[in-house]
Amino acid sequence: DTSAMMHHHAEPGPDKIPVHIDSSLEAIIPGFLANRQRDLTTIESCLKQGDLNTIRMLGHRMKGDGGGYGFDQISVIGDQLERAAMAHNLSALHDHLKGLKDFLSRVEIVYVH
């Protein structure tokens, strides 16, 4: 039933992930998220090339940076990426990469004063 499907898409996305961030960070958040998108692309190409060391370093940086900006989920994923890279666990790396991609595509910033 296509009308039900169309109706589903018109609803405000229940699949969005709201993240509450202090409004004083509003100027730097778009850049932070753009950098994570770039990390995503870098990690994908590093996985293809087997460059786990770069993934480990990016994961470590995400782990350190995420929480400071209010993105605890990015810190968690960064930690998972770092550990999986150190363990040479490619299937886990693919899973965590998917998790990061999913989070970035669904995150919705809610600025709080």
Language-model features and meaning:
Residues D1-H113:
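Two-component system phosphorelay core
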